Amino acid sequence: MKTIIALSYILCLVFAQKLPGNDNSTATLCLGHHAVPNGTLVKTITNDQIEVTNATELVQSSSTGRICDSPHRILDGKNCTLIDALLGDPHCDGFQNKEWDLFVERSKAYSNCYPYDVPDYASLRSLVASSGTLEFINEDFNWTGVAQSGESYACKRGSVKSFFSRLNWLHESEYKYPALNVTMPNNGKFDKLYIWGVHHPSTDREQTNLYVRASGRVTVSTKRSQQTVIPNIGSRPWVRGLSSRISIYWTIVKPGDILLINSTGNLIAPRGYFKIRTGKSSIMRSDAPIGTCSSECITPNGSIPNDKPFQNVNRITYGACPRYVKQNTLKLATGMRNVPEKQTRGIFGAIAGFIENGWEGMVNGWYGFRHQNSEGTGQAADLKSTQAAIDQINGKLNRLIEKTNEKFHQIEKEFSEVEGRIQDLEKYVEDTKIDLWSYNAELLVALENQHTIDLTDSEMNKLFEKTRKQLRENAEDMGNGCFKIYHKCDNACIGSIRNGTYDHDVYRDEALNNRFQIKGVELKSGYKDWILWISFAISCFLLCVVLLGFIMWACQKGNIRCNICI
């Protein structure tokens, strides 16, 4: 009897294997998308944190630590400031007639000549820096009646006393200093920059010893401007053994204009002019070393790549640079929404589609197919839908860079102490611009991320609809991104569905017949396999009970004899 019961139960299990889902006359085809075990969190318009399969960092947060010498021409100021090089400080003679794209001033730079001040220092520095050259042309000024080329022990060239090489210190000759009236026309086709100065003696005695008169006067004029300076005689803090000073001024003479110099003393005269050019050159204060490398973007911290649309290394930049923002990180989604693959698929090892989760390990594409048929299981990527999504996403980063990279941004804005209010206003404007750009950057990236996720979801839906239209009534949508195909569909058949050559008419009759042969109601729950197994197990148990009851009834009636041997 035990043998009979066991055989009955085994028979039930054998019949159980003939489930519709595992019948050779049907197949399952699922559509899915790429997934990774650990995705990247990005921000969208509707969600602060959403996980995607891949994302690109948009904020450059570090520099190379050195200033690249290419493609920009970098001039290292070393121990010289730009103004000292302009005036011709003896220890800056090596900078005469030099050219640059970016002049790098060092914190160790110092002056080593007659102590001076420049009332409009920032403007002169900016003007010369943007010109990009120290090209100097000597001119023959007629300084009749005075001695030229004054010198000072505070300004030594080698071991002998000297003076600024681009300036001519005029002083008395034979205790005479006549009034000077000199003109110099600009017959060229470019602007000329003249540097001149006024000497402020420390005592009245020094004044008369050098210029005879108790008080001098200097007036420099053009058709467009006039400057008059009266020396201020008096002692000042001692610098390099001197308590007197020189004030440096500058005048631009346009083509066709005339430079007119009138003086009755204290004039530090020009020896010629500097050519003024219009260009993209500039100046930067930095102690970063200059290295042999190539980078379009330079900051005081060093060069940085410009392959990202934003940077937070330094707000001061030169060249084609990413836009400065306050954020440390902004991530652009370059992949689809990530739904990690579940580890279990039920008792039958069933496959699942994109509605349930993504597929890990699909390296050949973002979208693809998995199938289960009489020949086994398989997987293949759909390259067309993958490429359609990639083509639209790849251009995002380049478009962001084009929108945000600044070409030769004004890197430094300086003002004298007198212009403190203007400086405060400028700082406020710059800070406001940075705040706005930081907000715009975050909003722009969130919009792009939202579009990327919507785009990749749309491509998945397009592929699903394309497949559904091919299969028509030959298959049933299982509701999880899969189709149950009601006809025998080998690997060649599956391949025709993937490449769009499937002919549903060929399989239509077979699919309809198989639909009618399937008994019962197919459950749509995720626990379908479990319920089917439990149902068959209960059925087999009841069958065994009925069979056992029949045997016992037959034994009672004498129709069956049961011998028990011990």
From Swiss-Prot:
Site positions for Cleavage: R345, G346
UniProt similarity note: Belongs to the influenza viruses hemagglutinin family.
Source organism of the structure: Influenza A virus (strain A/Beijing/353/1989 H3N2)
Oligomer status and interactors: Homotrimer of disulfide-linked HA1-HA2.
Gene: HA
Protein name: Hemagglutinin
Topological domain spans for side Cytoplasmic: 552-566
GO terms for MF: host cell surface receptor binding
Glycosylation sites: N24, N38, N54, N79, N142, N181, N262, N301, N499
Single GO cellular component term: viral envelope
S-palmitoyl cysteine: lipidated positions: C555, C562, C565
Signal peptide: 1-16
Modification after translation, per record: Palmitoylated.
Extracellular topological segments: 17-530
InterPro entries associated with the record: Capsid_hemagglutn (IPR008980), Hemagglutn_HA1_a/b_dom_sf (IPR013828), Hemagglutn_influenz_A (IPR000149), Hemagglutn_influenz_A/B (IPR001364)
Pfam family, one: Hemagglutinin
Subcellular location field: Virion membrane; Host apical cell membrane
GO biological process, one term: fusion of virus membrane with host endosome membrane
Keyword set, alphabetical order: Clathrin- and caveolin-independent endocytosis of virus by host, Clathrin-mediated endocytosis of virus by host, Disulfide bond, Fusion of virus membrane with host endosomal membrane, Fusion of virus membrane with host membrane, Glycoprotein, Hemagglutinin, Host cell membrane, Host membrane, Host-virus interaction, Lipoprotein, Membrane, Palmitate, Signal, Transmembrane, Transmembrane helix, Viral attachment to host cell, Viral envelope protein, Viral penetration into host cytoplasm, Virion, Virus endocytosis by host, Virus entry into host cell
Note: Major glycoprotein, comprises over 80% of the envelope proteins present in virus particle. The extent of infection into host organism is determined by HA. Influenza viruses bud from the apical surface of polarized epithelial cells (e.g. bronchial epithelial cells) into lumen of lungs and are therefore usually pneumotropic. The reason is that HA is cleaved by tryptase clara which is restricted to lungs. However, HAs of H5 and H7 pantropic avian viruses subtypes can be cleaved by furin and subtilisin-type enzymes, allowing the virus to grow in other organs than lungs.
Spans through the membrane: 531-551
Functional description taken from the UniProt entry: Binds to sialic acid-containing receptors on the cell surface, bringing about the attachment of the virus particle to the cell. This attachment induces virion internalization either through clathrin-dependent endocytosis or through clathrin- and caveolin-independent pathway. Plays a major role in the determination of host range restriction and virulence. Class I viral fusion protein. Responsible for penetration of the virus into the cell cytoplasm by mediating the fusion of the membrane of the endocytosed virus particle with the endosomal membrane.
Protein topology in the membrane: Single-pass type I membrane protein
